[in-house]
């Protein structure tokens, strides 16, 4: 699996791995790259079955497989210890990595994540699946911003959204791959295992997230032994895109604090 690695800003700089959500594209993290690359070696990638890592996914494709293939690619690139920043599905992959490779994951940041899918989130995905089945990729892509962004943010950026739609259609991961990745997301359940995660965790959520209620992050915080929760008042599901200034400050401060906390504990 192809990875994109930034040059380390200094010798032995900590590594931060960015894992996007259901869309799977590493470019989702563009608003974070410039600030992160000043302090860390940053790893981005298109998830298997998407973008520049095309593949046909099995029907039983799982979050555990997503975690294993990423860890194997990191080890092949010479990276054995790393912090993980995951958004939604990416946060699930991050938790799986922390469970399966505890010696490798130094810190976990969960952005609008959850222990197991909430009934409201499931309802949102049911609607989106119906759109996909009835209207194809175009209907899926057209509806996607409604679940990602606040209304006023979208209204002020119509040309940008049109360009994003065209790009998303051009690089659509395919109906079968999308549904198999979505099914993996829906099956994931960390409610009985989260307390085994021993690395420090930063939880970031947005109070106006239409797709994932903030209660999901509260449940995460209660279940994870060494976690802290930060709530953004604005930003929607893709709060790192819509309000990068606020998000980046939370992320940078959280990573610095938790990595120091981890080193002090060793």
Swiss-Prot record:
Keywords of the record: Hydrolase
Tagged with keyword Coiled coil: no
Keyword Plastid: no
InterPro entries, sorted: AB_hydrolase_1, AB_hydrolase_fold, AB_hydrolase_sf, Pyrimidine_utilisation_RutD
GO annotation, biological process: nitrogen utilization; uracil catabolic process
Record's catalysed reaction(s): carbamate + 2 H(+) = NH4(+) + CO2
EC category name: hydrolase
Pfam families reported for this sequence: Abhydrolase_1
Signal sequence region: none
GO molecular function: hydrolase activity, acting on carbon-nitrogen (but not peptide) bonds, in linear amides
EC number annotated for this UniProt entry: 3.5.1.-
PANTHER family, per the entry: MONOACYLGLYCEROL LIPASE
Function: Involved in pyrimidine catabolism. May facilitate the hydrolysis of carbamate, a reaction that can also occur spontaneously.
Family membership noted in the UniProt record: Belongs to the AB hydrolase superfamily. Hydrolase RutD family.
Name of the protein in question: Putative carbamate hydrolase RutD
């Amino acid at each position: 699996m192809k990875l994109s690695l930034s040059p380390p800003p200094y010798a032995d700089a900590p590594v931060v791995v960015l894992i996007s959500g259901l869309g799977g594209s590493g470019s989702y993290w563009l608003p974070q790259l410039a600030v992160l690359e000043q302090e860390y070696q940053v790893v981005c990638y298109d998830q298997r079955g998407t973008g520049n890592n095309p593949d046909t996914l099995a029907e039983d494709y799982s979050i555990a497989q997503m975690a294993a293939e990423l860890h194997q690619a990191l080890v092949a690139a010479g990276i054995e210890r790393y912090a993980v920043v995951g958004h939604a599905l990416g946060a699930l992959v991050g938790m799986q990595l922390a469970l399966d490779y505890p010696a490798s994951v130094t810190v976990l940041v969960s952005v609008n994540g959850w222990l197991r899918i909430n009934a409201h989130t499931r309802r949102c995905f049911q609607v989106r699946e119906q759109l996909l089945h009835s209207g194809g990729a175009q209907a899926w892509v057209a509806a996607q911003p409604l679940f990602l962004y606040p209304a006023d943010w979208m209204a002020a950026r119509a040309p940008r959204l049109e360009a994003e739609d065209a790009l998303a259609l051009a690089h659509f991961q395919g109906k079968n791959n999308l549904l198999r990745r979505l099914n993996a997301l829906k099956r994931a359940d960390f409610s009985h295992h989260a307390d085994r995660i021993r690395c420090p965790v930063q939880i970031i959520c947005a109070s106006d997230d239409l797709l994932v209620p903030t209660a999901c992050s509260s449940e995460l915080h209660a279940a994870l032994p060494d976690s802290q929760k930060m709530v953004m008042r604005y930003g929607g599901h893709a709060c790192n895109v819509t309000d990068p200034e606020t998000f980046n400050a939370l992320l940078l401060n959280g990573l610095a604090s938790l990595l120091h906390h981890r080193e002090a504990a060793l």
